[in-house]
Amino acid sequence: VYRAEALCGLCASDEMDEDDRAEWVPIIVESMLEEERAWRLAESIGIISKSAGNWPGARARKAMMSNLIAVTGGLPAGEARVDALKSISGKVSEQRLPELFLLAVENHGMEAKASRPVIKAIVGTKNLDMIAEITSSLTEATPDLAVKLLDNLHRLAVESNLGLHPTALELSLPLLDGADFETVRTLCSHAS
């Protein structure tokens, strides 16, 4: 991964043309995939996404981000995927955020933690259609998980002064019976 990170840094140079930068993307990805430790690969995804965000020219940057999303999806469910999603959520294009959201909810056992940074990035776009799209997905989860995710969405929407109708809090009310007591308590403390 160190090679991948170094190559990615070189791609930020204005002296490199876009075609060369685009040719290096698969080399960078191959170098990343040589890493066997999931936590280190997740860390590298963050470093490379930050560096690629500084590349001049959009074509190679878009290809790199697309590959980073694929590498993130290839990580095993767990803390490494949470870390990768946290580091990449604020750096991908708005159109790719629903894809990251799916990777987060597929991170079994850590869905809520993995979804937080992605939901934050989605709310940050203020794209009401996208927010409505993920909101319907949130309500389809198990009651406990749905309440956790809707609580997070509600908090972020309030912080961003987004007027969602119905609110995420209102959508969570019918799910409270099936949610864990601690989850309900947390929701109530955030609602006040």
Enumerate the language-model features and the residues they cover.
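Non-catalytic tandem-repeat scaffold regions and their flanking low-complexity/translocation tails
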Residues: 1-192
